[in-house]
Amino acid sequence: MSSQVLASSQKNDKTQNIIRPTTKFHPPIWGDRFLHYNISEQELEYKEGQVEELKEVVRKEIFHGNNKRNIINVSKQLKLIDDVERLGLSYHFESEIEKKLQHIYEITTNNIDHQDQHYYYSNHDEDLHDVSIRFRLLRQHGFNISSNIFEKFKDESGKFKESLKSDIEGMLSLYEASYLSYVEENILDEALAFTTTNLKLVANKKEHPLSHEISLALYRPLRKTLVRLYARHYISIYEKQPSHNKVLLQFAKLDFNLLQSLHKKELSEISRWWKELDLANKLPFARNRIVELYLWILGVFHEPQFSLARKILIKAISMASVADDIYDAYGTFEELELLTEAILRWDISFIDKLSPDYLKTYYKVFLNSYEECEKDLKKEERYKLHYAKESMKKLIQAYFHEAQWLNQGHFPSFDEHLKVSFVSSGYPMLIETSFVGMQDVKTNQVFEWLSTQPKIFRACTIISRFMDDLVSRKFEQERNHVPSTVDCYMKQYGVSEQEACDELNKQVVNLWKEINQEFLRPTSMPSSILVRILNFTKVLDIIYKEGDGYTHVGKLVKDSVAALLIDPIPL
């Protein structure tokens, strides 16, 4: 796949016979499929009207249907909230869900039976399924609920009761709950091991009614699944449940298809922007993955109100992707020195100092992309772009730092490597830039918070670094390449490749637990901010679960694109 070739970047390059380390990336698999999407404003407005109408029906039925003669069972209420979230509808009812969960938390925390004019709760009536859903939803939303509530499901020897193995629904719920664990929360580690072993046996029994749902969960638990992708799967599962709410189901289908229409329209605009840049022809050595990049961003924020945030982030991530290929797989060291200085200066007048011409091409497109972002922002919000620019400069400096290691033949220690590769992962830049276009980010408070490298920010970024290196290391080794975190860990600790990979995977598990703990109230930032970083982490399970799905676009990424951006749900 990789080779040393005699090449020049452009036909009119003055520099000839440069030996470049080039990598042959496969061409884009989508062609011009997303270039045009014809939907009229009238059709969109009609779809939006349908969704709004059903939204109010659901709001009244599910969230405001309580009265003195209609006492709601807590377990049933939690099941409804769980369904709303699994169907991808929670963004419509955030305040209602918060109010319901707050009330449920208050009446269940004391672990005593409770009945008032609206709610009925009995600790004695709760089975494993009920307790697991209550635990998962409350912890997911930051309520301080102890995992000790699962102690009652253990026997005298301290192990989970054998009788639970026959409660398949309960075990599946406990399995999902275990992924909300904190660091050193042993009971949830035990729960995960117990449920995984037994659920695998059920998953193999294709005739079991829950086998499909169990297989999905074992492959990717709810905590690590993108909201939209899970909604796509769960709509068909929910429809088969005899007790499903028909209005809620119809609302979920219409909402999914409406958002898909909005996203397809957005992607067509982005695809045309990308095609007009013509970088596929001007810089043919770089990966051409605009659709996959949009999928990445869609995982971070899919809600319609974040269209501007997506538009800004797609331009930043596409520029970073091309830069990554210049620094990692094409540019000479001397060229990289020039490009680094140019980006740090951020001044179009520096373009005349750039050579060969491919650097000029990239630099002009790079600066223009950020100018476009500035124009898209309201005047009073443009100060936020400063943070995006500074984070991009840091990314470029990290790319160059790694190029220096390669040029000098330096093999860094694991700790030294992580200081630089933490930034070169691209995630610090992407996370910071994601907040630039979010209109509910009104001040610089979020950016100042990020500058302190809070725990959730560090955990997410390190996960991205480790997951990338774990799957891309062998491909990168086919050419002269800077050592990965795996290589550096092996050298620093004198362990085998398998031992190093096992340790990094173990750290990823613990970093997920740190992310979970950062949602515990009171939080350092509003949950609307923390959720974006959580979503950045979730996307990694799509991109890197089965290899480097960005560089080598495989079935998992293709299927995800099809599910979210091609195939509507039949009504």
Swiss-Prot record:
Motif (DDXXD motif): 324-328
Catalytic activity: (2E,6E)-farnesyl diphosphate = (1E,4E)-germacrene B + diphosphate
Tissue: Highly expressed in glandular trichomes.
Keyword annotations from UniProtKB, A to Z: Lyase, Magnesium, Metal-binding
Recorded superkingdom: Eukaryota
Binding site for (2E,6E)-farnesyl diphosphate: 287, 324, 328, 465, 468
Molecular function as annotated in GO: magnesium ion binding; terpene synthase activity
PANTHER family xref list: (-)-GERMACRENE D SYNTHASE, OS04G0344100 PROTEIN-RELATED
Role this protein plays: Involved in sesquiterpene olefins biosynthesis, constituants of cannabinoids and terpenoids-rich resins. Catalyzes mainly the conversion of (2E)-farnesyl diphosphate to germacrene B, which is spontaneously converted to gamma-elemene as a thermal degradation product.
Domain-related comment: The Asp-Asp-Xaa-Xaa-Asp/Glu (DDXXD/E) motif is important for the catalytic activity, presumably through binding to Mg(2+).
Protein name: Germacrene B synthase TPS16CC
Organism field: Cannabis sativa (Hemp)
